[in-house]
């Protein structure tokens, strides 16, 4: 008999729940259309559902008619976007994750104090673009350990570092170690920039890996935290697949023996996770499902003031 070990926490985090509720509440309060800058979260199922309900996802504010309402995605935006929205008389609502906003504020503060900011993250990720926009002349993005050796700062330059919220804890630890080795005086926030949900999902998966021979991460290919979950398994030599629907689960799993771990990125709906479990049961009729609870999450973020009742 084979088992699926269902990692917990998995799926939606508080920031994703808040962001989706912002769009839903705006549609309920004002009706369609509601414009959203960038995908509200990186999950095709969520985005397609909101499109059906009247949300219009855009990348350029020029696609929003003057005077209309626009929501900023959970990933955050650079300040210039707010300025453009104001100039075009748009009614903007900010669904940026509270934990991303914290990093924006820290970058702005330390740049104003004369620090050079090291931002650990993926240069092209929308979250990193938004954070860097707070102080573009002061922020240098570092993606990997090798980048640290190429930094131009000498030991007399005041340095502060933060990270993208959805990175691999393994990668962050390696880059942080390299930064501190080269710049012992570098400082950072009192708590990790990697968000609680990213940490919990990675650590929960790590806890079950010794018991499994294969991992499914349910999440969108665009989702940074979903990709990092896949890497957590692969770095420990456990085969892993990132899938976003039951249609992506093939009979490949029949070529592997032993138990299977299932986890999901922070923007993956629970009903998609359960449909993937059902697909596995079709392929393996005697499959048993076991929940592994690493920790419980009770974090709730308040909606923007424009949508509070």
UniProtKB/Swiss-Prot annotation:
Residues that hold dimethylallyl diphosphate according to the record: 42, 75, 125, 223-225, 267
Keywords annotated in UniProt: 4Fe-4S, Iron, Iron-sulfur, Isoprene biosynthesis, Metal-binding, Oxidoreductase
Keyword ATP-binding among record annotations: no
EC number: 1.17.7.4
Binding-site residues, (2E)-4-hydroxy-3-methylbut-2-enyl diphosphate: 42, 75, 125, 165, 223-225, 267
Annotated catalysed reactions: isopentenyl diphosphate + 2 oxidized [2Fe-2S]-[ferredoxin] + H2O = (2E)-4-hydroxy-3-methylbut-2-enyl diphosphate + 2 reduced [2Fe-2S]-[ferredoxin] + 2 H(+); dimethylallyl diphosphate + 2 oxidized [2Fe-2S]-[ferredoxin] + H2O = (2E)-4-hydroxy-3-methylbut-2-enyl diphosphate + 2 reduced [2Fe-2S]-[ferredoxin] + 2 H(+)
Cofactor note: Binds 1 [4Fe-4S] cluster per subunit.
Keyword Metal-binding part of the UniProt annotation: yes
Uppermost EC category: oxidoreductase
Enzyme active site: 127
CDD domains in alphabetical order: lytB_ispH
Binding site for isopentenyl diphosphate: 42, 75, 125, 223-225, 267
Pfam families, per the entry: LYTB
GO molecular function, one term: metal ion binding
Pathway involvement of the protein, from the record: Isoprenoid biosynthesis; dimethylallyl diphosphate biosynthesis; dimethylallyl diphosphate from (2E)-4-hydroxy-3-methylbutenyl diphosphate: step 1/1; Isoprenoid biosynthesis; isopentenyl diphosphate biosynthesis via DXP pathway; isopentenyl diphosphate from 1-deoxy-D-xylulose 5-phosphate: step 6/6
Cofactor dependency: [4Fe-4S] cluster
Family indicated by similarity: Belongs to the IspH family.
Protein name: 4-hydroxy-3-methylbut-2-enyl diphosphate reductase
Gene (UniProt): ispH
């Amino acid at each position: 008999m084979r088992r699926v070990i269902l990692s917990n926490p998995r799926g939606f985090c508080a920031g994703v729940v808040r962001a989706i509720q912002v769009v839903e509440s705006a549609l309920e309060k004002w009706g369609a259309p509601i414009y959203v800058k960038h995908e509200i979260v990186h999950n095709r199922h969520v985005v397609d559902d909101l499109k059906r309900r009247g949300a219009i996802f855009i990348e350029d504010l020029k696609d929003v008619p003057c005077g209309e309402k626009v929501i900023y995605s959970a990933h955050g935006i650079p300040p210039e976007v707010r300025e453009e929205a104001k100039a075009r008389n748009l009614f903007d609502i900010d669904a940026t994750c509270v934990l991303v906003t914290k990093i924006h504020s820290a970058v702005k503060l330390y740049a104003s104090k004369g620090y050079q900011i090291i931002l650990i993250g993926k240069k092209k990720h929308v979250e990193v673009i938004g954070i860097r926009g707070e102080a573009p002349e002061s922020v240098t993005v570092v993606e990997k350990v090798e980048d640290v050796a190429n930094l131009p700062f000498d030991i007399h330059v005041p340095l502060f570092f933060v990270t993208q919220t959805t990175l691999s804890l393994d990668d962050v630890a390696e880059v942080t170690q390299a930064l501190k080795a080269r710049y012992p005086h570098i400082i950072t926030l009192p708590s990790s920039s990697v968000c609680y949900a990213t940490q919990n999902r990675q650590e929960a998966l790590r806890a079950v890996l010794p018991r499994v021979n294969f991992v499914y991460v349910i999440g969108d290919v665009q989702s940074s935290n979903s990709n990092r979950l896949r890497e957590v398994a692969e770095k420990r030599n456990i085969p892993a697949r990132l899938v976003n629907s039951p249609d992506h689960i093939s009979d490949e799993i029949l070529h592997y023996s032993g138990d299977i771990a299932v986890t999901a990125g922070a923007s993956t709906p629970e009903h998609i996770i359960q449909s993937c479990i059902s697909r596995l049961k079709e392929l393996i009729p005697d499959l048993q499902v076991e929940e592994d609870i690493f920790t419980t999450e009770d974090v709730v973020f308040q909606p923007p003031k424009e949508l509070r009742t």
